[in-house]
Amino acid sequence: MNAAVPMLAIDGPSGAGKGTVAGLLARRLGWNLLDSGALYRLLAFAAVNHGVDLTNEEALKLLAAHLDVQFVAADDSHGQRIILEGEEVTDVIRTEQVGAGASQVAALPAVRDALLQRQRAFREAPGLVADGRDMGTVVFPDAPLKIFLTASAEERARRRYLQLKAKGADVDQSALLEEIRERDERDSQRAVAPLKPADDAILLDSTEMSIEAVVETIIHHCEQQGWDV
């Protein structure tokens, strides 16, 4: 881990807007981008495509070691483009089914260990914006700036509903709310790297904030670090 390279760690629950915010910040700062949650989605997606059972730790660990992925910051609702083995998979890994699979494989210690060094390798000059569930607590505990971005479960369900409806999906908002609550409980209760703010993280509740307001708030904290924004 290159501690000399500046970085911003953004953690928080599903649907809090971490990916969009991280992508916009990476573009603004001109830094590298890491979407930790997408790595688990990518692994779950690849596992299904390769016929690997999502409970098979050894097979998943081997598959994780060969994931060829790039995150390209973009100025849109995703905040990024995700390239897996040369193919863009930004949208196809964002289904609720893949998300559930990602949460399932993320609970496996061997899988988390396999992806840990991969994630740390993203910390290269001129800097890194990393978002996930344990960036500030496990992956980059020495990050100089840590943000824990959250929002109410109801607001996160509303945002996800509007996002899916805009894509023409037939979704039920109450079902999305239930899924988010279940995922929150699973992620916060898991034995390995449970979802929680780092002791030195700045808590940011975006329930009544626009994406632009969230970005500007974090930029203010970046300025306080003396970073060129």
UniProtKB/Swiss-Prot annotation:
Highest taxon of source: Bacteria
Sites where the protein binds ATP: 12-20
Keyword presence, Isomerase: no
Residues in coiled coil: none
Subcellular location: Cytoplasm
Main location: cytoplasm
EC number(s) on file: 2.7.4.25
Pfam families referenced in this protein's UniProt entry, alphabetically: Cytidylate_kin
Assigned keywords, A-Z: ATP-binding, Cytoplasm, Kinase, Nucleotide-binding, Transferase
Database matches in Gene3D superfamilies: P-loop containing nucleotide triphosphate hydrolases (3.40.50.300)
Gene Ontology molecular function: ATP binding; CMP kinase activity; dCMP kinase activity
InterPro entries: Cytidylate_kin (IPR003136), Cytidylate_kinase_dom (IPR011994), P-loop_NTPase (IPR027417)
Catalytic reaction annotation: CMP + ATP = CDP + ADP; dCMP + ATP = dCDP + ADP
Enzyme class: transferase
GO biological process, one term: pyrimidine nucleotide metabolic process
Matches recorded under CDD domains: CMPK (cd02020)
A GO CC term assigned to this protein in UniProt: cytosol
Family membership noted in the UniProt record: Belongs to the cytidylate kinase family. Type 1 subfamily.
HAMAP family: Cytidyl_kinase_type1 (MF_00238)
Protein name: Cytidylate kinase
Species in which this protein is naturally found: Pseudomonas paraeruginosa (strain DSM 24068 / PA7) (Pseudomonas aeruginosa (strain PA7))
